């Protein structure tokens, strides 16, 4: 299987909306190459600085690189994406450039790794690629060694970062956790590092379960986390203190009642993957079911909600 790399050079004002369009149409990640970074060589909010190569960046504006499965990226999808981008009010249509290239499966396996380096995803958690060596900068730093494979995110998406921040705030060692749609297993590993002893990781995709198990092994918790195939919480009979779901909004909407029923009294539903246009509907549904919304995070057009199961 090959991959299509769609490369778009646009103005800064259109980056956020353009990125959302690409992700909503199924891009397996979006790389952002900002020409301003060459000038500023900025350090991130946790103090890390990376050496940047001029040849990797456009002369001006921002280059977005989106990756699509060649089997599903057809003329119809190509035109739909282009039409939506060109309809953005924020887009400078005089300076937009589109290009494509095919990346063979064997090249793709290594191409995405060029953009994945250790980074601090939240106050406590640092994500470390399995092929890199990293030394902790502080005693309280918790490192998650990750090899997401080609089909799963690297942990740098805003929804993952917000979930990690919520885990830092609400998950305690004495809690039990169920991670719905575990993907790479990153949120289960984070819960383990907090000290949680009972963790169950579910995913409907057996490949995800396999990838998660391998990442659990890398983080020395493969015997401590139960990783199993599962269709949301439809067949779940156990009770947990924490339900975590970083998945798409319409799927979250389907599982809100099941999440409430799965939680012990006083438990927390940590959920993200919600675009800002849909979060009010998700929040209202959670409140109707009985959740008290105790936290709301926004980051780059995405929202993370934390609801607590409380008695009337």
Swiss-Prot record:
GO terms for cellular component: cytoplasm. Its EC number is 2.1.1.-. It catalyses: L-lysyl-[protein] + 3 S-adenosyl-L-methionine = N(6),N(6),N(6)-trimethyl-L-lysyl-[protein] + 3 S-adenosyl-L-homocysteine + 3 H(+). Signal peptide: none annotated. Methylates ribosomal protein L11. PANTHER family: ELECTRON TRANSFER FLAVOPROTEIN BETA SUBUNIT LYSINE METHYLTRANSFERASE. This is Ribosomal protein L11 methyltransferase. It comes from Staphylococcus aureus (strain NCTC 8325 / PS 47). The lineage of its organism: Bacteria, Bacillati, Bacillota, Bacilli, Bacillales.
